[in-house]
Amino acid sequence: MDIDPYKEFGASTELISFLPADFFPSVRDLLDTAAALYREALESPEHCSHHHTALRQAILCWGELMTLATWVGNNLQDPASRDLVVNYVNTNMGLKIRQLLWFHISCLTFGRETVLEYLVSFGVWIRTPPAYRPPNAPILSTLPETTVVRRRGRSPRRRTPSPRRRRSQSPRRRRSQSRESQC
C-alpha cells in the first residue's frame, strides 16, 4: 500500500520532501516542543483536532520504534549488524518521524494554510535556479498576509511622528491561544 500520511491535511510526502533533511529539528527537540506547547491537549481524553490525533500517533509510534531498537540493540551480538540497524532507524524512520512531528506541530502553531503556503513557496524557491532566486529561502512565520514589509532605501522614514498623528489607544492585535485550552 502506498499511504501518504499528509493527504487528509492537504499536503503530500512529495511536498514535504522539498525541505532538506537537515531542516527538521531532532526528534528530541520536536518532542520537547510538542510537550511544552500541547501537553495538556495531547494527554486529554477529549478529541481536539486531527493534528493533535496525528501528533499523538507519531509520538506513540516513535516510542514503540525506540523500544524495538533498544531490544534489537541489546539482543544483536554482532556490532556491525547493530550499527546497521541503528543507522537505518535514524536515517530512514527518524527522518519520517521528524517530518511528521514538524508538520503537525507547525500546523497547530501557525495554522494549516500558512504551513501549506510555506511548503509551496519553499518548493518553488528550491526548484528555481540559484541565479534567478532570492538568496534567502522563505521563512515560516506568523505574519498575516496583509502585512507589508518595506525594503530598506525605498523611501526615507521620519524619525518622529507628526504631531497630528496619535497612537492608537487599542492594544495590538495578537494571535494568541490560551494555554488552558489548546483545542
Swiss-Prot record:
GO cellular component, one term: host cell cytoplasm
Source organism of the structure: Hepatitis B virus genotype B1 (isolate Japan/Yamagata-2/1998) (HBV-B)
Intervals holding Sequence repeats: 155-161, 162-169, 170-177
InterPro entries assigned: Hepatitis_core, Viral_capsid_core_dom_sf_HBV
Compartments it resides in: Virion; Host cytoplasm
Family: Belongs to the orthohepadnavirus core antigen family.
Compositional bias of kind Basic residues: 149-176
UniProt PTM: Phosphorylated by host SRPK1, SRPK2, and maybe protein kinase C or GAPDH. Phosphorylation is critical for pregenomic RNA packaging. Protein kinase C phosphorylation is stimulated by HBx protein and may play a role in transport of the viral genome to the nucleus at the late step during the viral replication cycle.
Modified-residue entries (Phosphoserine), positions: S155, S162, S170
One Pfam family in the UniProt entry: Hepatitis_core
Region called Disordered, residue ranges: 136-183
Single GO BP term: viral penetration into host nucleus
Motif extent (Bipartite nuclear localization signal): 158-175
Domain of life of the organism encoding this protein: Viruses
Swiss-Prot/TrEMBL keywords: Capsid protein, Cytoplasmic inwards viral transport, DNA-binding, Host cytoplasm, Host-virus interaction, Microtubular inwards viral transport, Phosphoprotein, Repeat, RNA-binding, T=4 icosahedral capsid protein, Viral penetration into host nucleus, Virion, Virus entry into host cell
Subunit structure comment from the entry: Homodimerizes, then multimerizes. Interacts with cytosol exposed regions of viral L glycoprotein present in the reticulum-to-Golgi compartment. Interacts with human FLNB. Phosphorylated form interacts with host importin alpha; this interaction depends on the exposure of the NLS, which itself depends upon genome maturation and/or phosphorylation of the capsid protein. Interacts with host NUP153.
UniProt name for this protein: Capsid protein
